[in-house]
């Protein structure tokens, strides 16, 4: 018998819903109903972080349906950017310091050293800030740290997944290339603060990641190229306020990729300064600020003649197809690429130097493995570009063994 059905004078009687319970139920209803009501009134939420909005959880996920509702509702609050901006303004205006945004004041930072009690083996995700403020105005994405301290996959499993993808691609007669775009906090670690949440656990995994993954998977390690490029430039390859490399980094990646496929092919390239335009920085948006940085692009003539770049904005959620007439200095084998946002700053130069290339987002492999398999089967070269934080953190679901197997079956039926 439920306690609420007992007589009120019974010592075990408990009302089904007390006053506090009703308040909690009303608050929960308002929280989850607010996105629906805002959508009905015409308000639309926009991505605040460097990722798509969380999708509505499926009822087939069991308890995952209920745990996923929080992310869905939070992401779809149309006034979320204004709320973040208000919190930041109050914190700086009243208290004279930035809002913590997930960090917890006081105590020893998780993974931050400093002696005392040992940190828990599994740090609380709420301790990690969205943004890490470095010296001289440098801002770093908090996921550079949190994903390494709270990885979804062990490094051995990540390496196994990458090797399996290489195996299924090469077994079909195709060439395979993997490029790793390093985190800004890796390339410019000297601008990180001395103390921050997760410092030690991030450094440990980062060191092991770069020591093992390129050698074990045959990946193209962009770190030496970017450091040499930075040494020869007046401006850093990354801006202080965005988590992505500039076009100079994207162009350097394309050059490394082309040379790996056809050594010497870039000797005829003519690269000159191109147009400039303003681009919204992604990191300040996480603390409610709207800042822009000046993008300096390039022209690229693969044969030393006319510029062949094309600027087509895309997040690759819808595959981007780029074709042009083959010229000297170009890779003319059909190439199919899985890439994330770092390649957005490289796509003009891929268009200039690859006569037939299609780029799709890693999320597409999970949502439509058959469609991605058919796309990859159109190419003779398959290339992956993965960012360090997502790869080291095991955040690419396509690294699961069944994903490579499903796509590999399609490639096997369509050999080169």
Please place each PLM-identified region on the residue numbering.
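Extracellular glycan-modifying ectodomains
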Residues: 1-416
